[in-house]
Amino acid sequence: MYSKFFSTLCACAVLGTACKKEDNKDPQPTPTPDAKEYTGNYILKTSLKNEDGKSGSSYLQAINKLSATESVDNSKAEQVPYMSSVMIYDNEVYSLDAIDGAYGVVKFQYDRSNGKLTRGAKMDTPAHAMPCNFVKVSDTKAYLPLYNSGTVWIFNPQTMQKTGEIDITSYAHSDNSPDAGFGVIRGNYYYLPLLQLGPDYAPYADHLQSDVLVINTQTDKVEKLISETATHLAMPSQPSYNSCIFMNENKDIYIMCAGYFGFNPQNTHSGFVCIPNKGDLSQTNFDSSKSWDISSTPIEGTPYKPNTIYSVVYLGGGKVAAFVSAAELNVKDPFTDKNGIAVLMDLNARTIKKIDGIPYTDSHSVGIAKYKDLVVFGVSGKEKRGLFGYNPTTGTTQQLLTTTGGADFFYAFE
């Protein structure tokens, strides 16, 4: 979501300001009968929205228990920029600025023995560059796309020092930045989707397609630009959700495409595009027969069809857990309306089914993660907020934790 893309959904970060009365209430846990409790090492990020739905404050903390009878506030949390993203590698937790660039990239160390999160080194980035994510090539090398600047920084995660950069401005459709999203490494290549958003914070009307740069991780050179133009699916990946780009068991790369993010009633196309694993770089390209525009697929268990897709996690066997939006649930303001529906998708059968027991959520609290036998959904619902678990094997759901503010990120250390 962010300046071009982020500005649509959050405009600017206003930390520590008055939040909606609804978001400031501390909801009481409502235990699910026979709900399981879990103990472990977890990282949680929650956010409180202001009345405009585009600004607010976010909090990052370590917790050690998931229980339907427990609630967690933000009194022991580290305040981080609103709409900031989180990256975790081993015991290293990274918080990345979302908008103004003043925060940069901050590294925390997680101690599993005592469950403590300790703030460490910081790497500054240019103002308004928006360093939303990074992908490790090795322990000493990582790629950090700067969404607004048209560059990909190369840095050492151990020293938190920049070591180089890749200029990708020439691949922008109409301005100076192609708006790099979240990439993935397959073999010796870094596949970096380009959102290509215009000044109205939406895909260009004359560029409704999905572009991906293929970068050689040994030379740091762009080898080729590939594009899926057949289905007109646009906005591939998102800058802040690593699971929006994933590989299946065959190492075929699938990329979530949000399209107009539900803001254009005349264009509700969203779904997935695919780069099959051909092995040879010369044969690497999209396969449009594997693309799936979900806009015409009914959501089983509801009267709706999706007008965009917010977030996904690949479960294996062609199954995907996701949050999708339905236009009919936009009552007042798409920034704050509870229009997000938790669903189970089948990439092979091309079906979408509502997951019962997960409250509808807003467009920001849409984090999804896998933990043990569960899919964990972060939710900011009308009556309930927090983490909810879904067991794909049994089809059962339960609330795992009540939070102050919407839960938008969860991670379990194995």
Go through each PLM region and give its residues:
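Loop/turn-rich, solvent-exposed surfaces of beta-rich toroidal or solenoidal domains
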Residues: 304-373, 377
